[in-house]
Amino acid sequence: LSGMDENAASLARKWGLGLELTDFCEARKLEEPAAMEAARARCSGIGSLWLHAPFAELSPCAIDPRVREVVMLRFRQTVQAALALGIRRIVVHSGYIPLVYFPEWFTARSVEFWREFLRDAPDGLCLALENVMEPEPDMLVQIAAGVDDPRFGLCLDVGHANTRVSETPPLDWIAPMAPWLRHVHLHNNDGDWDLHDALGQGMIPMPDILAALAEQCPAADYTIENQNCELSLRWLCARGYLEEP
């Protein structure tokens, strides 16, 4: 369950599920001791954990080398924070912005960035690169193939794949990403804005998505990304995916 729901931690404990920590989505909190203590308390008693890295203004493909230095610093701080909390799985946004970065630049510079980043990263780390504003999965697939490191994979955000910036239906993202897919963000929308609606509220054919993921990416795990995750938990229970606690 995503920490974007303020009740996610208590729901995770109640339902026996994991938590994707969002406490450090704002990069400044990486340097605030109080934020670390709050995150530690939130994680208490939860066995399966992911950490969502900060993302605003952090593009690994940044054109300005000084900006790239800041991105490298913030993601290294993210790894340090995760390890301090006993977390080894981290979701990172790709940083792609349409009409700002040419796809060729974005993929080449991203591969370069992540190879450099992973030189100093510990064994056993898992980074999952998430789609946000990409029109199709090919750029992320090229990055994962180019980085070619067992610590580096992909995160399919099903909701982002159904917004106005995506030119590819969500179902068609799965097969290309499958060899590298480590994690999935689940939420629904109306095909336009990134609403993060409950799984049953929107036009994404969620049963078809879940069936395709189970068949093609059985090792991937999932985060429900809603501001009210309980609605999606009830939807999953009603269809036999989960049992109520």
Give residue spans per PLM region.
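Charged helix-capping and loop-helix junction motifs
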Residues: 33-38, 67-76, 104-114, 166-175, ...
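Alpha-helix-loop-beta-strand connector modules within alpha/beta enzyme cores
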Residues: 39-56, 110-124, 206-213
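Helix C-cap/helix->beta junction micro-motif
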Residues: 15, 44-47, 85, 121-123, ...
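Hydrophobic faces of well-ordered beta-strands that scaffold small-molecule active sites
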Residues: 1, 17-21, 49-53, 90-92, ...
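Acidic-and-aromatic substrate-binding clefts and catalytic sites of carbohydrate-active enzymes
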Residues: 1-9, 22-37, 59-62, 98-102, ...
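Histidine-acidic metal/acid-base catalytic patches
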Residues: 7-13, 88, 137-152, 156, ...
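Active-site acidic/histidine proton-transfer and metal-coordination neighborhood
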Residues: 61-153
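N-terminal pre-domain/capping segments
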Residues: 1-77, 243-245
